[in-house]
């Protein structure tokens, strides 16, 4: 991606520009780049507390170039608002006469930077970017603007990973003026051949540049990148004469390569006719390849709906690199921002005074029935807090928040939207560890907020929708344990689900109820006359206030009716003080005055909690759904949308409830059909959880199950196990248990979450379901092979390996006929079984065989494989290799998520070896992080490292109580999971640390035993028990110590040092300990000398320290 910098010699801008920017109202001025006609600075606008990029023109602008700049800004102004074109925030002239333009600052930099740092993009991500940029170019072309320099460096990435086209510094309104003959305004590697040959740029040349940009994203370099030492003219000749390199050789789908080739065709006539055509072709490629189909936002005229709506993908955003992921849980941006009011707000000073008096109390509770203006007041208070410098997050509660994990995920996301650096990795913890991580996440969040020393408030709107006790307990924990840096502002119908009593006793509660929320006459006058545009006499205002009991919703509906020509006197005669009567009367006075087409549209559009043009069109069976929504919004019909996501709409809850009641008059069959349409639209556009919800609401649970089953591999393979299990919980149990594929997906999710018992249950149900399913024999064989691999994983988790090879045989005999996750997991499982049989040399070829499949699984298979390599190397005393393997595994796991299960697994094993090599501090940090998250299962070697070595580290640090707690928890885990080898390790460590064992346990350990040699796990368990017996005897009288010495010698002699080097070394050290304990100092020194040398050579210093020999 090498390009000539045409401005390399223009770095002489007058140095007082930063001073002029400060004078213009900008702070923290920092130069970040040069291009176009000047320099780009990163600044802060104090008035809005936001970072911006300011582009300042250079000093040598002549009149024509100045006119060009101003024309550029007019073009940009006409394009502002498109989601994939950078918005122009301000244009002005500095004190020295230099024009400047202000745009949002993009901290994530450009697509070029992303590619340079992380390499080529996945083809699915590239298609997604291509569709969006095609929409941006089409929008520009429709207003007569050519970009002229589309390339990765001119595509910036928003904080949400969305691409935005920028730098129209060489763009101009078509026909405005011509660039001097022979001057190429653009980057050669991305410029169309005809432009290089002297032709004027056209929309077709922008299409070529878009294709060249996508080629670069797919390969990591330009199609005609300038070679080392190559002259520019030679590069031009290659671009104009040679075909582009064949992308099929990169392993890309043929239709992906063909689409790029057509966009980069040598002759303009052979390219797609418009940028929109490019976008539609890329969408067709997405559809054929079974990936999520992106929408291509284009400007539309009122009443005209284009072929595909622009909003279907708006809530399905993802990061700028890698494969797109389904959000967890999938949520619209509207959830994290108060809805934009349909009219002006009324200032309610008496209520904000109450809130202000609440100071920094942990909870501000605003509670009243629907329609009292709770959310509006919270939004106003949010604005006031923001002006005072607080960071204020917003979270609107919906039914999905009745799942504790999803609620916490939403809470973290809302906070990250106002403080992106807070809780960066905690969301991933929730996804992988589910319910177990709740307390850890909340504690970590409280600590981070406190340590950040920054005031944060979170508005939690509509809390009454939560009935789940675990979710309520989570919020209660946050309120009980939070600090005064964090304040929660909760709106709800009541006080239910909140620890109001405790907070009131501690003076941590400020409260506003329905009595306070009711409008008084002055406030009602402001609402009806000032904001509502009416001219009601004071007497009528007072009468309306009295008859509505100051209910904000009723007053708003009354204003709407009166603006439509209603008579105030007649309106007042029809009102009573009962809220239900007011609600029904005023709602019908609004709805029944509408034309039938609009009334019918509002009824059907209310079926879903949120809607957009495409969805509303599908529900109503029309093509202009977006125009109808905009018309309803324009007429103030209680339809709201947010500033940052204008494509999605939501009805005011009270009005939506009324519409639902009216809709139900048409019969349940009609409502069910609308839910079916909604389910179909959501499923087609990639919103699984909403598709499932509406299928269930339609009374079609079979379709809901089908939807999840069809999507069964996507969520687990993206490590969205908790999301999958939460969605499955919504489905009828009787239907879930009868679906073989779905049970297999549930088993995968539970295995990946380290939950062997639920996984085994799912596998058992799988067999029953498969026996009843009418599937082709080949399909059944594939599913059984996959299930057997999962059973093998469950076996090794249970510390049994006898059946593992048989269970893996089918999958390992035909790996290429199965999904990559199956042979990839099989290879890891076979390797772990080999370790348990002391066949360490066999581990490496097994993992080499599995590696190609693990690369297609994502990072998790690679993390496990590196851990297994490290375990084999450690047992062979190849300490250098083991450390490298564990470090690699930890680095890859941490890249997935700092608190991911993969990182913690690798971290525990790395910590064990760090401890043995003397790095107590490093081992302690890793062990503490692993221990806090908890785990329901896993291989015994991982659990032993976590509990046993974790306890040993605590003891070495002087925390004997912490060590005992670790061992106690480990002992409970061993009993619960039925793991004798783990129990033996726990008992052995208790003896080492001087923790007394129950008499019966000690007696069993002291009894003579024969160590089996035909089963590796039984061998290790018996050896641990014999080690424990030796240590117990060593603490006794002289006769016992002599017996200990004899048994230790026999134990060491029985271990084959060539086959099991580490075990042999550990047994030798134990024998030396007993020799010293019996007073045989000379013998002990003689045996210690070679052992000490070996430990020093290997760096295993801690082995001798723990034995008291160093």
UniProtKB/Swiss-Prot annotation:
The active site is at residue 149. GO terms for biological process: regulation of cell wall organization or biogenesis; regulation of DNA-templated transcription. Its EC number is 2.7.11.1. Disruption phenotype: Deletion affects cell size and cell wall composition, increases survival during persistent infection in mice, and increases resistance to acidic pH, hypoxia, oxidative and stationary-phase stresses in vitro. One of its GO terms (molecular function) is protein serine/threonine kinase activity. The modification Phosphothreonine is found at residues 179, 181. PROSITE patterns: PROTEIN_KINASE_ATP, PROTEIN_KINASE_DOM. It holds the Pfam family AAA_16. Residues 308-343 are annotated as: Disordered. GO terms for cellular component: cytosol; extracellular region; peptidoglycan-based cell wall; plasma membrane. Forms oligomeric complexes in solution. This is Serine/threonine-protein kinase PknK. The gene is pknK.
């Amino acid at each position: 991606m090498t390009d000539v910098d045409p401005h390399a010699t223009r770095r002489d801008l007058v140095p007082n520009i930063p001073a002029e920017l400060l004078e213009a109202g900008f702070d923290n001025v920092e130069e970040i780049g040069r291009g176009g006609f000047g320099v780009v600075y990163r600044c802060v606008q104090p008035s809005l507390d936001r970072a911006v990029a300011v582009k300042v023109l250079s000093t040598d602008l002549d009149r024509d170039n100045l006119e060009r700049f101003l024309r550029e800004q007019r073009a940009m102004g006409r394009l502002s608002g498109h989601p994939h074109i950078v918005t122009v925030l301000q244009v002005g002239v500095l004190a020295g006469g230099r024009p400047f333009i202000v745009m949002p600052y993009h901290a994530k930099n450009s697509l070029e930077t992303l590619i340079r740092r992380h390499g080529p993009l996945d083809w699915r991500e590239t298609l997604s970017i291509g569709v969006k940029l095609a929409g941006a170019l089409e929008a520009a072309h429709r207003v007569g603007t050519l970009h002229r320099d589309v390339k990765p460096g001119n595509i910036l990435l928003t904080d949400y990973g969305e691409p935005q086209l920028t730098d129209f510094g060489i763009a101009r309104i078509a026909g405005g003026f011509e660039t001097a003959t022979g001057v190429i305004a653009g980057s050669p590697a991305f410029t169309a051949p005809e432009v290089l040959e002297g032709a004027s740029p056209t929309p077709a040349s922008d299409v070529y540049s878009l294709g060249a940009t996508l080629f670069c994203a797919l390969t990591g370099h330009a199609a005609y990148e300038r070679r080392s030492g190559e002259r520019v003219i030679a590069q031009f000749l290659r671009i104009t004469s040679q075909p582009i390199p064949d992308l099929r050789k990169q392993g890309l789908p043929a239709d992906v390569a063909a689409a790029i080739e057509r966009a980069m065709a040598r002759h303009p006539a052979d390219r797609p006719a418009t940028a929109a055509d490019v976008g539609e072709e890329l969408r067709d490629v997405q559809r054929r390849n079974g990936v999520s189909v992106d929408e291509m936002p284009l400007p539309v005229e009122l009443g005209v709906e284009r072929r595909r709506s622009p909003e279907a993908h708006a809530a399905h955003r993802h990061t700028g690199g890698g494969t797109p992921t389904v959000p967890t849980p999938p949520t619209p941006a509207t959830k994290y921002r108060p809805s934009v009011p349909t009219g002006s707000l009324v200032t309610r000073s008496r209520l904000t005074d109450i809130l202000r008096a609440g100071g920094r109390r942990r909870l501000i509770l605003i509670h009243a029935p629907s329609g009292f203006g709770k959310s509006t007041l919270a939004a106003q208070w949010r604005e006031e807090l923001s002006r005072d410098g607080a960071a204020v997050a917003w979270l609107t509660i919906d039914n999905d928040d009745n799942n504790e994990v999803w609620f916490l995920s939403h809470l973290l996301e809302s906070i990250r939207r106002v403080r992106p650096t807070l809780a960066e990795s905690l969301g991933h913890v929730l996804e992988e560890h589910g319910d177990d991580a709740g307390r850890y996440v909340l504690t970590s969040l409280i600590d981070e907020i406190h340590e950040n020393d920054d005031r944060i408030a979170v508005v939690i709107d509509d809390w009454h929708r939560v009935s789940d006790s675990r979710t309520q307990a989570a919020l209660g924990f946050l309120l009980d344990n939070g600090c005064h840096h964090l304040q929660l502002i909760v709106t709800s119908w009541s006080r239910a689900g909140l620890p109001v009593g405790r907070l009131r006793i501690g003076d941590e509660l400020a409260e506003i109820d329905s009595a306070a929320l009711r409008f008084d006459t002055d406030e009602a006058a402001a609402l009806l006359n000032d904001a509502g545009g009416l001219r009601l006499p004071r007497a009528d205002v007072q009468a309306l206030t009295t008859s509505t009991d100051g209910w904000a919703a009723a007053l708003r509906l009354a204003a709407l009716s009166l603006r439509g020509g209603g008579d105030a006197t007649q309106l007042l005669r029809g009102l009573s003080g009962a809220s239900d009567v007011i609600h029904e009367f005023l709602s019908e006075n609004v709805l029944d005055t509408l034309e039938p087409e609009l009334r019918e549209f509002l009824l059907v559009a209310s079926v879903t909690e949120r809607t957009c043009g495409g969805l509303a069109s599908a529900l109503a069976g029309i093509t202009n759904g977006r125009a109808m929504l905009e018309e309803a919004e324009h007429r103030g019909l209680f339809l709201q949308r947010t500033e940052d996501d204008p494509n999605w709409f939501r009805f005011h809850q009270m009005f939506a409830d009324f519409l639902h009641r009216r809709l139900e008059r048409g019969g349940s069959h009609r409502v069910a059909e609308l839910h079916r349409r909604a389910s179909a639209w959501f499923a087609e556009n990639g919103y699984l959880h909403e598709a499932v919800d509406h299928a269930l609401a339609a009374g079609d649970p079979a379709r809901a199950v089908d939807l999840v089953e069809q999507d069964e591999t996507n969520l687990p393979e993206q490590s969205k196990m908790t999301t999958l299990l939460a969605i499955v919980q919504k489905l009828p149990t009787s239907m879930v248990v009868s679906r073989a594929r779905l049970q297999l997906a549930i088993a995968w999710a539970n295995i990946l979450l380290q939950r062997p018992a639920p996984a085994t249950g799912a596998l058992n149900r799988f067999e029953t379901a498969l026996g009843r399913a009418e599937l082709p024999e080949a399909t059944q064989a594939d599913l059984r092979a996959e299930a057997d691999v999962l059973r093998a994983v469950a076996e090794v988790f249970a510390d049994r390996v006898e059946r593992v090879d048989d269970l893996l045989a089918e999958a390992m005999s035909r790996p290429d006929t199965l999904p990559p996750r199956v042979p990839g997991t099989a290879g890891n499982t076979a390797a772990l079984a080999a370790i348990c049989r002391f066949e360490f040399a066999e581990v490496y070829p097994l993992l080499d065989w599995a590696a190609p499949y693990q690369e297609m699984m994502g990072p998790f298979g690679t993390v496990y494989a590196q851990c297994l390599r490290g375990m084999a190397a450690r047992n062979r005393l190849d300490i250098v290799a083991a450390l490298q393997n564990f470090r690699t595994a930890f680095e890859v796991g941490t890249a997935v998520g700092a608190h991911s299960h993969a990182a913690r697994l690798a971290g525990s094993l790395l910590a064990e070896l760090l401890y043995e090599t003397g790095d107590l501090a490093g081992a302690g940090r890793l062990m503490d992080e692993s221990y806090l998250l908890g785990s329901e299962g896993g291989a015994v070697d991982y659990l032993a490292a976590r509990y046993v070595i974790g306890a040993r580290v605590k003891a070495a640090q002087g925390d004997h109580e912490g060590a005992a707690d670790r061992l106690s928890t480990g002992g409970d885990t061993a009993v619960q999971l039925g793991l004798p080898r783990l129990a033996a390790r726990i008992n052995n460590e208790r003896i080492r640390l001087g923790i007394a064992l129950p008499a019966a346990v000690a007696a069993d350990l002291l009894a003579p035993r024969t160590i089996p040699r035909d089963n590796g796990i039984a061998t290790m368990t018996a050896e641990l028990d014999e080690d424990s017996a030796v240590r117990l005897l060593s603490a006794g009288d002289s006769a016992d110590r002599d017996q200990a010495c004899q048994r230790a010698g026999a134990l060491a002699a029985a271990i084959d040092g060539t086959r099991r080097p580490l075990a042999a070394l550990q047994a030798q050290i134990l024998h030396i300990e007993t020799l010293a304990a019996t007073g045989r100092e000379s013998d002990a020194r003689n045996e210690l000398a070679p052992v000490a040398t070996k430990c020093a050579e290997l760096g295993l210093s801690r082995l001798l320290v723990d034995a008291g020999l160093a």
